[in-house]
Amino acid sequence: MSKIGKCILNPNEINLILNINSQNANEIIDIAENLAKEFEQIPATKMRDFYDYVLRIDEKNENWYKELVLLKPKLAYNYGKETNRRKKEALEKLAGTFSEIIDKIDNDLNKFKNFKTFFEALVAYHKIYAKSQ
């Protein structure tokens, strides 16, 4: 299976994201802000579309993880159709990073909920740094 992009987070950062608690909350916020800067070339509306897709996943549905995994081809599609070099590079980073996070969630509902919390912070910071709306 081909993978688009390389994860720009280290394993410890991914572990923090998927295991948010009161002791590491400030680190999570820093990670979200730093990633938002990395993804500044992605239009805010596109980032919001990805976030909305994740929000629509029903945690009570036994197939929630399958729906989450389908975010990978959605990211790949957006990467593939992008013609602007800078936006494409940012989408490549996003696809690689989220692919790695999704793999680490591995059907663990609590980790998924933590990812959604992190993604909310990322989208909030991204709105500040996004180059185009």
Curated annotation (Swiss-Prot):
One GO molecular-function entry: RNA binding
GO biological process: defense response to virus
CDD domains on file: Csm2_III-A
Keywords: Antiviral defense, RNA-binding
Task of the protein: CRISPR (clustered regularly interspaced short palindromic repeat) is an adaptive immune system that provides protection against mobile genetic elements (viruses, transposable elements and conjugative plasmids). CRISPR clusters contain spacers, sequences complementary to antecedent mobile elements, and target invading nucleic acids. CRISPR clusters are transcribed and processed into CRISPR RNA (crRNA).
Subunit description: Part of the Csm effector complex that includes Cas10, Csm2, Csm3, Csm4 and Csm5.
Protein family: Belongs to the CRISPR-associated Csm2 family.
Note: Encoded in a type III-A CRISPR locus.
Protein name per UniProt: CRISPR system Cms protein Csm2
Organism: Methanocaldococcus jannaschii (strain ATCC 43067 / DSM 2661 / JAL-1 / JCM 10045 / NBRC 100440) (Methanococcus jannaschii)
